[in-house]
Amino acid sequence: MSIVEMGKNAKQAAKELAQANTELKNNVLHELEKSLLDNAEYILQQNQKDLDNAKKNNLSKAFVDRLTLTPARIESMAQGVRQIADFADPIGKIEKGFKHPKGMTISQIRVPLGVIAMIFESRPNVTIDAGALALKSGNAIILRGGSDALHTNIALKNIFQEVCEKHGLSKNIVQLVEDIARERVTELVTLDKYIDVIIPRGGKSLKKAIQQQATISMIETGAGICHTYIDEFADLDKAIKIVINAKTQRPGVCNALESLLVHQNIAEKFLPKLEIELAKYNVELRADNESLKYLGNAILATPEDWDTEYLDLVLSIKTVANINEAIEHINTHGSMHSECIVTESYTNTEIFLNEVDAAAVYANASTRFTDGSEFGFGGEIGISTQKLHARGPMGINELTTLKYIIRGNGQVRG
């Protein structure tokens, strides 16, 4: 099927879905939850094909981790779908209303965006998260995943479409671009006749390529050059715990720690202790000259390291003179995703939280919490790093827009 045909089908499916009531949408989602669990063996078989190809292509461990589905991860996907079903339906919600002096009533209500095109890389769970969020918020969605996850994505798409049709909804509510040629992406991001918004979920190169080609509004998500700043007033045991979690729990995700900033007054005491702990996880350290004085197995960082999202067990480290230098570095090199300060100083906490420009700013907690499920949104369609329309984890409400309904009785403007 051509991209144009997919766009036409999605537009029609969105019109039909806009008429679906909450009960029907929730029934579909509960059925999807059950179907994911019932078809776990089929999903894992298809996922194994992608994993075999990834290993043949010598892809990194972090990449393979993002690609891998397990029974536990399928269960987590199903739980996410259940959460989405349990959330209040935003469509038709009256955000505010008032009566005009001329007697008209004016209401602001939530409506679907329409047709969403989502382009993402190697995480197949996105197929289900994005599809479920789109359905609950009344949108049709066209997905274009990475070629490395094609078998898994097709399996998940098939399950989703079967459930939709079983409940009398169009299978075109969720479509997948199965042709992996790059030309199809260009066609997709210029299909402004049928698509209302593009959501790219991936690294800087993906977003840059789409920005250069797209003729459709875009919501940027994904790239996470996340920092943690260890202040001179930090509890060092707490700091080590936070850094280890943020860097090593799942290094291949966008909310993982990539760059560590350490106040010069504690670097000598803190860095050797941290290096011992990070060595247990085989984390490669790339440090500036000042930090190298206190590290035994680090290599000298290059200027490029401060702007790199490793998505792997690699960490850049820089010693800074004060909190102001830390904030300046973060606002220069960060991707406006998630940033953290570890400190027992109330004053420095407030300075950092107020002055760092990011979607999520933490005090004394791992950046790994920037996630739709952790924020209570169920699944997420992505983590927006821009400022317009949506910022941070994007759940159901972020996939809607506003519409004004004016009810009159013959009023005219004088």
Swiss-Prot record:
Keywords: Amino-acid biosynthesis, Cytoplasm, NADP, Oxidoreductase, Proline biosynthesis
GO terms for biological process, alphabetical: L-proline biosynthetic process
Enzymatic reactions: L-glutamate 5-semialdehyde + phosphate + NADP(+) = L-glutamyl 5-phosphate + NADPH + H(+)
CDD domains assigned to the protein according to its UniProt record, in alphabetical order: ALDH_F18-19_ProA-GPR
PROSITE patterns in the cross-refs: PROA
GO cellular component: cytoplasm
MF-aspect GO terms: glutamate-5-semialdehyde dehydrogenase activity; NADP binding
Pathway terms, separated by semicolons: Amino-acid biosynthesis; L-proline biosynthesis; L-glutamate 5-semialdehyde from L-glutamate: step 2/2
EC number: 1.2.1.41
Record localization: Cytoplasm
Class in the EC hierarchy, top level: oxidoreductase
Pfam families found in the cross-reference section: Aldedh (PF00171)
Entry annotated with the keyword Cytoplasm: yes
Classification via InterPro entries: Ald_DH/histidinol_DH, Ald_DH_C, Ald_DH_N, Aldehyde_DH_dom, G-glutamylP_reductase_CS, Glu-5-SA_DH, GPR_dom
Major localization class: cytoplasm
Function description: Catalyzes the NADPH-dependent reduction of L-glutamate 5-phosphate into L-glutamate 5-semialdehyde and phosphate. The product spontaneously undergoes cyclization to form 1-pyrroline-5-carboxylate.
PANTHER family xrefs: DELTA-1-PYRROLINE-5-CARBOXYLATE SYNTHASE (PTHR11063:SF8), GLUTAMATE SEMIALDEHYDE DEHYDROGENASE (PTHR11063)
Family indicated by similarity: Belongs to the gamma-glutamyl phosphate reductase family.
Protein name per UniProt: Gamma-glutamyl phosphate reductase
Species whose genome carries this gene: Francisella philomiragia subsp. philomiragia (strain ATCC 25017 / CCUG 19701 / FSC 153 / O#319-036)
Lineage: Bacteria, Pseudomonadati, Pseudomonadota, Gammaproteobacteria, Thiotrichales
